[in-house]
């Protein structure tokens, strides 16, 4: 394995699993050259911070548009031309897509050029681009069982969702009154507002918070903490060391993207999930139920979310450390900490398959 392209974009939920696989590939093959092809969003900073080369392509989501709208979108023409040039120039042994519209053209370009391809589908309900690509790639890696037959069974392997090593190593349930709050890499206004509204109750209960707000809401949330006499030093737009943040928390309040759900499980943390209600096919609710049905998490629909409801739920759980530890153990039972390794090994398999056929 000499050269690999990883491709996705949009949010940390897509990018972090790809980076976990990149880390695993570099551990196995230190001389392997990795190129990350993404969109024009926050992925460039995340990827370059990890020391990986990055190329950007135009990409734009077409939520609810279906397959026809993907192919009729204006950006796809220039993105395909650029992707074909990048793949032809880099000459990778394989290209792995991790979902999102930014990852569509590079995988399709690689397939057209005869390069071995694979995708990873992280959600319980596949997105439109992966449903298209699943028909042509050599291997489909899935986080959840494909109950809807979205992908050909013969080439689909359930591996879980790759999780960053620092989160896997963060340890189990901490016996503290610290709650980690985040709404994904870009924040979540509904969660931020509910936390602010419940701060007085949380302060009275002696609960401390570490809060990732996203850039847009940072000042508003910081002022809310300040006005309630809460520590603003633990409020930030983005938490770079999530392993440390998970390690010090005894409870997590968050959205339910697949990356988040599998991170929470790998860290062995009980959670209160507040699924994003406008996610495609409401996949976040399906993701959250995977842990809630095990008794590892609570689920609050955003329509029912408010400061009092959230604060009361946090206080009730923090007061019962035995229950929290039980929830954390159940979360760990769901975790798939070998997902990155399974994907790296699977990609090696499809490269070897091409090599054998080429030599025949």
UniProtKB/Swiss-Prot annotation:
Pathway named in the protein's UniProt entry: Cell wall biogenesis; peptidoglycan biosynthesis
GO molecular function, one term: undecaprenyldiphospho-muramoylpentapeptide beta-N-acetylglucosaminyltransferase activity
UniProt subcellular location: Cell inner membrane
CDD domains (UniProt xref): GT28_MurG
Biological process according to GO: carbohydrate metabolic process; cell division; cell wall organization; lipid glycosylation; peptidoglycan biosynthetic process; regulation of cell shape
Database matches in Gene3D superfamilies: Glycogen Phosphorylase B
Gene Ontology terms: cellular component: plasma membrane
EC numbers: 2.4.1.227
Membrane topology value: Peripheral membrane protein
Catalysed reactions listed for this entry: di-trans,octa-cis-undecaprenyl diphospho-N-acetyl-alpha-D-muramoyl-L-alanyl-D-glutamyl-meso-2,6-diaminopimeloyl-D-alanyl-D-alanine + UDP-N-acetyl-alpha-D-glucosamine = di-trans,octa-cis-undecaprenyl diphospho-[N-acetyl-alpha-D-glucosaminyl-(1->4)]-N-acetyl-alpha-D-muramoyl-L-alanyl-D-glutamyl-meso-2,6-diaminopimeloyl-D-alanyl-D-alanine + UDP + H(+)
UniProt binding sites for UDP-N-acetyl-alpha-D-glucosamine: 11-13, 123, 164, 185, 239, 284
Chief subcellular location: membrane
Keywords recorded for this protein, A-Z: Cell cycle, Cell division, Cell inner membrane, Cell membrane, Cell shape, Cell wall biogenesis/degradation, Glycosyltransferase, Membrane, Peptidoglycan synthesis, Transferase
This protein's record includes keyword Cell cycle: yes
Task of the protein: Cell wall formation. Catalyzes the transfer of a GlcNAc subunit on undecaprenyl-pyrophosphoryl-MurNAc-pentapeptide (lipid intermediate I) to form undecaprenyl-pyrophosphoryl-MurNAc-(pentapeptide)GlcNAc (lipid intermediate II).
Family: Belongs to the glycosyltransferase 28 family. MurG subfamily.
Protein name: UDP-N-acetylglucosamine--N-acetylmuramyl-(pentapeptide) pyrophosphoryl-undecaprenol N-acetylglucosamine transferase
Native organism: Maridesulfovibrio salexigens (strain ATCC 14822 / DSM 2638 / NCIMB 8403 / VKM B-1763)
GN (gene name): murG
